Design a protein with these regions (language model features):
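Class I SAM-dependent methyltransferase SAM/SAH-binding core
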Residues: 58, 62-109
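Short conserved loop adjoining the S-adenosyl-L-methionine
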Residues: 110-115
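A short, conserved alpha-helix within the catalytic core of class I
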Residues: 129-139
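Conserved beta-strand signature within the Rossmann-like core of class I S-adenosyl-L-methionine
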Residues: 146-154
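Short alpha-helix
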Residues: 174-191
Length: 217
């Protein structure tokens, strides 16, 4: 399931990327900035959806500095396949800093959970997976009926480049190469309702979007 060469290469490069990206960043300054970044995303979400203080929240594919950072007032679960490596090799991530989070080591494809979560975040992680179909199914399956799914994605802006990037590792970190409509349809075809789409950042190859869905029921 996670044995494809693109996925293995992406996981190797992901860790190296984080080491490179954080190499000159002071831990305290970076964590303060990143937490505020997530707080700003939550403010955007609040225009369209809300949840109670006793909500159960999942951060799927969290990485070392995920949405969990900004959810200190909630009961949170978070998972990522590289959490042990992040904690061992990055000074910017220690699980003990987040006592309100239940961390687990898992891929999206392997994550199986009863529908107990009111809100599921998957922030810039879905294009990292090996099996897109099972990963999408597992995200939805973790939600309670009527639950909220919030994603950020990098969506291709040009069909021609999307085809090229799919054929060769033009974007090594991301085995999945989709455009906005393809991302939206992954969830619409599974009965989710699209609540909001917001462009966060534009670039030549990719647009960075915030997507909000609600599970049927």
């Amino acid at each position: 399931m996670n044995g494809t060469w693109k996925w293995k290469l992406a996981q190797f490069v992901e860790l190296k990327w984080w080491q490179w990206y954080l190499r000159n960043k002071k831990t305290e300054d970076y964590l303060k900035w990143k937490k505020q970044y997530w707080k700003d995303i939550l403010k955007k979400c609040a225009h369209d959806v809300s949840w109670s203080k006793d909500a159960e929240i999942l951060d799927a594919g969290s990485g070392p500095a995920g949405m969990f950072m900004a959810l200190e007032d909630y009961s949170v679960a978070a998972f990522d396949p590289l959490l042990p490596e992040y904690e061992a090799r990055l000074q910017h991530f220690k699980k003990e800093w987040y006592p309100y989070v239940r961390f687990a080591v898992s891929t999206l494809e392997a994550f199986k959970n009863d529908p107990i979560f009111d809100v599921v975040f998957c922030m810039n992680a879905l294009n990292h997976v090996s099996d897109l179909e099972s990963s999408t199914n597992n995200l939805i399956a973790a939600l309670k009926p009527g639950g909220i799914l919030i994603l950020t994605i990098d969506a291709h802006t040009h069909t021609s480049f999307k085809k090229i990037f799919r054929a060769i590792p033009g974007d090594i970190l991301h085995p999945q190469q989709l455009d906005l409509n393809e991302y939206q349809n992954l969830f619409l075809q599974r009965g989710c309702k699209l609540v909001a789409t917001e462009l966060l950042k534009h670039s030549f190859f990719f647009d960075h979007y915030l997507l909000i869905f609600r599970r049927s029921g």
